[in-house]
Amino acid sequence: MTITAQEALQRTIDHREIFYDEMLSLMRQIMAGEISPLMTAAIITGLRVKKETIGEITAAATVMRELATKVTVPGPDRNFLDVVGTGGDGANTFNISTTTIFVAAAAGARVAKHGGRSVSSKSGAADVLEALGVKLGLAPEQVAESIEATGIGFMYAPAHHSAMKNVAAVRREMGVRTIFNILGPLTNPASAPNTLMGVFHPDLVGIQARVMQRLGANHVLVVYGMDGMDEVSLGASTMVGELKDGEIREYQIHPEDFGLQMMGTRNLAVESAEQSKATLLGVLDNRPGPAREIVILNAGVALYTANLVDSIAVGIGRARELIESGAARAKLDEFIAFNRKFA
């Protein structure tokens, strides 16, 4: 079922839903550059104001997945993981989720990390990995080879979502969060079935979990720190939307549930990718402090999401062991060394 740009805009003005098949049509038009930048900006603003529905987000993510340059990774999916965030929490923390992937891979997860450069923070996943010497924009078969060899592959979002070029200028000029901010974590080009996803607003916890359910995901934890972080927080309770065995459960977790001391997260902020790199290396070198503790917490949740442990508590204990033993740092070094062969 097709819908014109004008009809879609009117629907948002009236605070009425754009139905799934209509949203498929609309997104295909937008991504093909068939709708003008002015109308694209108006429509995505209208969607934001009326609040995007689960059906609208699912349809938009489906189109982005259709158009993505995919990465095919053979082998079992049970421990195949992405750790990703929407960004936009305004905290400017170091790259917690990127640090977490090295702990997860050291535990035996296969990680297909999907991300880009910073939009709203001081250092995006691509920025800190580049600072570490990682080559961005590998071909799909090279990403797959890296996952097979090291347990980690990084998919640089612009290399896999070329159709986004048709909305890039609009997003940049608008400078506000739109539906595209929440689509990135839903559109992993390797179709990792297990995802630890941080979000920037509490309403998105249940929404993103239900979108992932409709998209056929296996095990997903969507998290929002009550202090505003799009991570599992050390400074407050964290809202969780968990998809497991086809069912969704929403609950809260607290650092002290797992024997972790609550710590303020203000001193986790960085001003640059180089600073984030230094913090990441400090964590993986087992330097004590809140940065290490928040990675242990998030990595524990990641191990649970990847079905490597039966509970978050066990995952946290395992994550601490992997950092203290040097296994997580060794995994980082292995990934960088393997990646250099493509330079």
Swiss-Prot record:
Pathway as given in its UniProt record: Amino-acid biosynthesis; L-tryptophan biosynthesis; L-tryptophan from chorismate: step 2/5
Cofactor(s) needed for function: Mg(2+)
Gene: trpD
Enzyme superclass (EC): transferase
Residues reported to bind 5-phospho-alpha-D-ribose 1-diphosphate: 85, 88-89, 93, 95-98, 113-121, 125
Protein name, as recorded: Anthranilate phosphoribosyltransferase
Entry keyword set: Amino-acid biosynthesis, Aromatic amino acid biosynthesis, Glycosyltransferase, Magnesium, Metal-binding, Transferase, Tryptophan biosynthesis
EC numbers, comma separated: 2.4.2.18
GO BP field: L-tryptophan biosynthetic process
Quaternary structure and interacting proteins, as annotated: Homodimer.
Pfam families: Glycos_trans_3N (PF02885), Glycos_transf_3 (PF00591)
